[in-house]
Amino acid sequence: NGPATLQLFGSGPILNEALRAQQILAERYQIAANVWSVTSYNELRREALGVQRWNRLHPAEPERVPYVVQALTGFDGPLVAATDYMKIVPDQLSPWLGNRLVSLGTDGFGRSDNRQHLRRFFEMNSESIVAAALSKLSRDGNLDPAQVKAAMADLGIDTEAKDPARA
């Protein structure tokens, strides 16, 4: 597979979906991914805000770097963050992760009878994580859009499904 070109964040029970997505990416699409277990997006944000405050109050000192930025140093490529909370939870890291972040979460109201259907409905199951990663690679110019379209079909992604946040 070579060096990982994707970073996958998973939290709580969704970590298993990220691990499965890593396996699918490697086996079906020959794309390596690192999986990161995020125990608290809120704590990562608090720490980053604390660093930001310190930097603001100490302009003559060398800038400090938030932990989330330090941890990702040397790990390139898009970052797909999946959670069983709303997308805004991982989105709160976007000031430090920039445009490489794609957040997946449970925005809206589910009409699912089990967890597997719920995760598929909200597009944060392993197949949706793979689809988001491939789409971001394509948008960044690193993967042919035709390959992504074929992968969406292979993964059973309904590209015309109603947005779960508005369903």
Residue ranges and their predicted role:
Residues 1-167:
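Thiamine diphosphate
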